[in-house]
Amino acid sequence: MKKCFTLLALVCATAAQAHVTLDTASATAGTYQKLAFRVGHGCDGKATTGLTVTLPEGASHAKPMPKAGWNIAITDSGALHEISWKGGALPDAYFDEFVMQVKLSGEPGKLYFRIVQECGKVSVAWDEIAGEKMKAPAPVLDVLPAPAGVPQHVH
């Protein structure tokens, strides 16, 4: 029985690493939040060479954390807000995090961050939203209402 639980835990841990995920499930509306996007593998055995995060409406003022060996590009053209890390190499056998800080709007709800993971000439879009059997789900952050009486301008 103990072996069964150990095996189940390993299978679940492997499944959890199969997508680009967020390090936190929820945050408070109206605050600044550090978000770490975890990349658990490359693309069919190839190293990850780029990651682009598209910010949803409700997340703004993004500031990426520098990452040694990677170039950062910020695109802010009206409705499109993206942060890209490119030029590095994250081998398929390893995981890493791509980190940014964002300002969350005062509105509670779910924010879906669309991701494009590049592995040389191959790319994977992690952009599926709300479904039971998604192959490439977008990371989601549940924005919770701010408690009454708590200032919302928190860094």
Spans of features found by a protein language model:
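Sec/Tat signal peptide C-region and signal peptidase I cleavage site
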Residues: 14-18
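Low-complexity, serine/threonine/proline/glycine-rich extracellular segments that form mucin-like
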Residues: 25-64
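A surface/secretory-pathway sequence property marking extracellular, secreted
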Residues: 56-81, 130, 142-151
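Extracytoplasmic/periplasmic copper-protein system
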Residues: 121-155
